[in-house]
Amino acid sequence: SGARIKRGPRMIAMMMPILALGKGRFTINGKGTLLKRPNKPMAQALRALGVDIIGRDKDFRLPIILEAKGGIPGGTVKVDANMSSQTISSLLNIAPFIGKDTSVIIKDKLVSAPYIDITIDILNKAGVRIRKRQGNCFFITAHQGFRPAVKFVIHGDYSSAAFLMAASCLVKSDVT
């Protein structure tokens, strides 16, 4: 049996480490442009943390097979973050459930640093303590789990809404 999740690359970046926490053989697949998208940074990070992962090619394009053993051993992982912050955020999200203390080290220039800050802020509010060490190194103590959910206000994505607002100025009808 399986689940079909009709979403894009962000969902893949989030699901790979979540599935690695489980137990069993998981296949992540997609269609269209998702089959062309490399998933190498996340795959390399998970391998460094002790996860068995197989990709279609050296860039880990879909389909990807995860052999999950009931948890992620953990340790130190160095991550390329020069293209996206998604790998870092996804690793920070699952780090409190990893088997031993974990260090996430960013090897190069971190793009989208505000997204990492948001991730850490939300995790802190859920009771997860992430310590930033020298440079771009994050240390997470194992087995923290999450405390009960806190109430969050999610603000609108005004940068994306701008396209719809501009479209409404161009047509003689409502854009909703």
PLM regions and their residue ranges:
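Structural preference for solvent-exposed beta-strand-turn elements
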Residues: 1-176
